[in-house]
């Protein structure tokens, strides 16, 4: 089935003109909760200590924190770095997280 004429599709010409620095980037934050603590989503987690390692289950609560990395592509001329052309750059999007963990440990013997 062909794509209907009413659906807007960017032409190749438009894609080459656009600057990818202004694209929308969806977050990895796909889990929502009604529970908030200090205006941040909060989930109770389970963990286990095994063989001197701590394993903890975590969920993303970073709420759309995204880092964009841009680097000069292989084969691109160094002097081309002053004039923006999307073909001269590699664009990467990273969703980063930082965790602070507090643990209350109960010693038991199995």
UniProtKB/Swiss-Prot annotation:
Keywords: Capsid protein, Host-virus interaction, Late protein, Viral attachment to host cell, Virion, Virus entry into host cell. Gene3D superfamilies: Major capsid L1 (late) superfamily, Papillomavirus (2.60.175.20). SUPFAM superfamilies: Group I dsDNA viruses. One of its GO terms (molecular function) is structural molecule activity. One of its GO terms (cellular component) is viral capsid. The keyword Nucleotide-binding does not apply. It is found in: Virion. It holds the Pfam family Late_protein_L1. It comes from the Viruses. Self-assembles into homopentamers. The capsid has an icosahedral symmetry and consists of 72 capsomers, with each capsomer being a pentamer of L1. Interacts with the minor capsid protein L2; this interaction is necessary for viral genome encapsidation. Belongs to the papillomaviridae L1 protein family. Forms an icosahedral capsid with a T=7 symmetry and about 55 nm diameter. The capsid is composed of 72 pentamers linked to each other by disulfide bonds and associated with L2 proteins. The capsid encapsulates the genomic DNA, but does not bind DNA. Essential for the initial attachment to the host cell. This is Major capsid protein L1. The gene is L1.
């Amino acid at each position: 089935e062909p794509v209907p004429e009413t659906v807007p599709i960017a032409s190749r010409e438009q894609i080459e003109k656009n600057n990818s620095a202004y694209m929308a980037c969806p977050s990895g934050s796909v889990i929502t909760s009604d529970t908030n603590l200090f205006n941040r989503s909060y989930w109770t987690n389970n963990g286990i200590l095994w063989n001197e390692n701590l394993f903890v289950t975590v969920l993303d609560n970073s709420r759309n924190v995204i880092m964009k990395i841009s680097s000069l592509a292989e084969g691109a001329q160094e002097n081309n770095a002053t004039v923006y052309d999307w073909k001269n750059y590699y664009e990467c999007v990273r969703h980063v997280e930082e965790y602070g963990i507090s643990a209350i440990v109960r010693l038991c013997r199995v």
